[in-house]
Amino acid sequence: MKALIVCASRSHGNTRRVADRIAEALDAEVVAPEAVDPSVVGNYDVVGFGSGIYYMMVDARLRKLIRRLPAVDHHIKAFTFFTSGAREIPLLGYNRSVRQQLEQKGFEVIGSFSCRGFDAVGPFGFVGGINRGRPNDDDLDRAAAFAGRLRKRVVGSQAAS
């Protein structure tokens, strides 16, 4: 199984920590969106797309990469992962939006993971931030378990074809 993880992580490195834990389980390389050549994404069996959430939005670098991706004709599997200071607001739906964009490109999105991350941006900075210490060991263990389930699903689908 050949895996790639695209991770847009800024501020405190929360999302990168999650990406690294998922990468261990998938034996994957973690790269920033601007380091990805869109034309090679089709060479992977599974691609993870992850971002910190900034003001309820996915990082602009990841959004730009997804827009630039060519259509994939053989349904490469994909997954998403996010860290955020607050819960997703259903009306804004950043996870749904990314999923739909990937599906429009031909990816089969097989899962999503999210957890809280330390957030000291905007008004949270005035109170020293929220979710200090997150993602914590429990969050990272959940990320590893998520990746284990992804691995089984991808390898299982390869064996079936």
Which residue ranges define each predicted feature?
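Conserved SAM/SAH-binding loop
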Residues: 33-36
